């Protein structure tokens, strides 16, 4: 059974766990919206077009992301970060295609701003956490690309030093070092193994783990982004590359991997529960928790659907850990404990206590 002592302490991994939930929500959001909302009706698009004069000149197909990215890049250059986020938030509320690619579009706003300023601090001062902190990840991508592959090994440990000094182990510190993971994937041409080794140059285990999470997340995003490709995800081996990476990378890998496993299993949660049960013993619980995050993310944190998918676990250990992952995702999705409480109250008594305890502890971090 799941026990609370398996949750990492704040200093050892507090924001790593938060980041794992938050960053992977975006993977689930992309997949869930592509799976459930592949098109937008003509009538709805007409209404949206009136609300936003530039956003919907893009086609509603795989090319739409590239088109929207260019629009937000230009808009951010011309009007600044706050106005770009105002536009993005309005579009997010009414169109599934924007919801699908919201994190990527936030990356674009961050990259664009970072290209125009001198350093991380200046770019971060204008940031917005909307859509799972994509802005900050985009900033770091730009910063790393500016430094370049040749100079990066020497400079990598110092890039987030100022933020670390101001707010050590904070969410901002986490976003900085997690964003480095995105950035090193950029400069290594999405070489996952080389990128993980680059993360090992950081100063402590917490920063390294946060960076690993960025690498594995970028690998997942390479699979769903139309202008990228991952060489490290296999349809016939749904838990690859977690099965082959070195031991220190496995936790972060399995914390991301069920999003890919669900895609190749056509969202058969029962099948992926079984796949989780067959991996290395030390990582079975985190795999179940990853499925809980996906159960929430695939349903936009709908109580009944999330509960139903978690109850597909074959035993109490699988179901309990799924609920742990799900309730964290509810808190992250809503930035509130109200909806998470609704999930907990919907459960049998045997699951309510761990759900409520996890919810309360996790909500304190926000």
Model-derived features: positions:
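Non-catalytic tandem-repeat scaffold regions and their flanking low-complexity/translocation tails
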Residues: 17, 29-366
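N-terminal Sec-pathway targeting helices
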Residues: 6-21
